[in-house]
Amino acid sequence: MLLLEEKIHKKVVIVGIPGVGKTSLVTAIVEKISDTGIVVSVQSYGTLMFEEAKNFGVKDRDELRKLPVEKQKELQKNTAENISSLTYDIVFIDTNAFISTTEGFYPGLPNQVIQIIQPTHFIAISARPEEIYNRRMKDETRNRDKISIESIKKELAIQDSMLSTCSVLSGSPMKVILNNEGKIEEAANNVIKAIGV
């Protein structure tokens, strides 16, 4: 437990493939932490990149991953600089560990981004592949590519390898948190414990 005199300043990268329930979980985490008087901000990396990309004529967020990698790098760098200047007690950086591009899997957090943001923690939200599959199939609000249990397992493996690399490069801890069906409260408490709040 932190003493009130201590100044908290954490930058927590939180990732999860579609269907792990990341958005709902982040909402629950923020509510719990905010109730303690700690000032929390959630920054959606993709949304911030999209806002800047509009200046280049990008009209849809899904177009971001279709941009040339060099343009994505530029947008990532600018977004990282904006996030690094934030002074909230805790900043959650909601992002993807990887982006599936026409050139292959591109890291959501390349080294230059890590060096700019200097995250204090990396959290990977996960769930059983079958649960992820079922959640994706029920989600009619998204236009997702065809999926299988095997492709979900591959995505989870890529996410873990990308995020563990980020942990090595930054020297900050990484924790995988399971967000199993009906256990969001438990998952939220596990994230809060992992970041030392």
Regions found by a protein language model. Name each.
Residues 2-5, 161-197:
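NTP-dependent small-molecule kinase module
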Residues 17:
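P-loop (Walker A) phosphate-binding loop of NTP-binding proteins
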Residues 22:
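Conserved lysine of the Walker
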Residues 95-140:
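ATP-dependent NMP and nucleoside kinases share a basic, alpha-helical "lid"
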